């Protein structure tokens, strides 16, 4: 993909997420819908980062500030960055309402323009699978992390069909044949999303081993891959349909913690 194509795709992605901002928090898996889920996220972050103790954290593609607030709960000095002003407006309003001292910046996760060695930790949720140039993004994140700092990537393969997606599709077709279910009409937003995802780097799905290998090539070491996200997903399932819950449980989801070595 050439530079011009990259630019056009990135603009499409920015426009898409700006369009989604108004309803983003209504969907389970975006906003937190229970204290059980909040606690599960806190546990994940503490497992890899420890307590905040005023350390500087950067939440990339921060959206409406969900992860930023979870990190703030743990005592981190949080900066959220997103390239959608519509998302940032939601995040700032939420921060004012909750009285949280979080800085929200308009910026690009692949080119943050932040100073070298400026953050103790970086966190991303469901960003990597949508990146146009993940190698460039990882190099940028490595640059802005302090020596000894940690990156936590929470992501998954949301593209490859699983047994659950195949089962749900077959059941939907069967029920439609019996006249017990109306055919689902295509949603324009969903088609736009699919068109975009067909052109990103991980268009066939962001598998943990591929992301880990790319992080290692960037210079991160050590790297730990964590598949123990059951508490988060169990809490989310209580707020979605049975079919969606099956799909979510069958997906390849993970958290990868990667460290920037201390300078010697």
Regions found by a protein language model. Give the residues of each.
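Conserved class I S-adenosyl-L-methionine
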Residues: 1-53, 66, 70, 150-181, 229-231
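Core SAM-dependent methyltransferase catalytic element
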Residues: 218-221, 238-264
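A short glycine-rich, Lys/Arg-flanked "PGG" loop and its adjoining helix->strand segment in the class I
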Residues: 135-147
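Class I SAM-dependent methyltransferase SAM/SAH-binding core
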Residues: 56-60, 64-111
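Short alpha-helix
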Residues: 201-219, 225
